[in-house]
Amino acid sequence: MEEAERFPRLVSLACHDLRTPLATIYGFARTLTRSGDYDERTMRFLGMIEAAAEQMTEQLDDLGVAARIKGGRFDPLIREADTLDLARSEDARVETVGSGERVETDAEAVQGALSALAIAAIRHGPVERVTWTVDGRSLTLAPVTDAAAPVVLGEQIRDLGAVVARLVVEALDGSVALDGGSLRVVL
């Protein structure tokens, strides 16, 4: 195995091996929470453990995707999706407007990438809300402050989701670029 392949394989292996103990932590916290036999404080702590385990699972997923892309083993699941739907987020701080276009892409990976870019813009802005403006294959995220721009672009390695988001978009032949106070993604 060449050196360039070794590190991405190591990261993939670590992600895989960490899932079992993490699933155990999540499973026990969830089981205890469902029993409801605890005081309010303990239930709150169990909920925090559950939420942290879910977040860590998402981060392991991101690391696995990055390792597959960097290792040349990314195998996207291509299907037709509307760009407006891809930009929609469950997070109330992210608004989506405009008109989409049907594209062939890895919808789940792209939707996760767009969500991660929006959350990074909010977190590192810091700003209260952001908006995706969709115009066909072109999606514009605003505002992206000067403080958030290098993080959202993945140039400053301070947000795993943003770094992986850019890798995903570019692996699917898209682009991510700063355009004044906004981020432009072309799918």
Segments the model singles out, each with a brief description of its role:
Residues 12, 27, 58-72:
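Conserved E/DxxT/N motif and adjacent residues on the DHp alpha2 helix
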Residues 41, 70-81, 102-104:
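Short flexible loop/turn segments at helix-to-beta-strand junctions
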Residues 165-169:
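Detector for a conserved hydrophobic position within an alpha-helical segment of the HATPase_c
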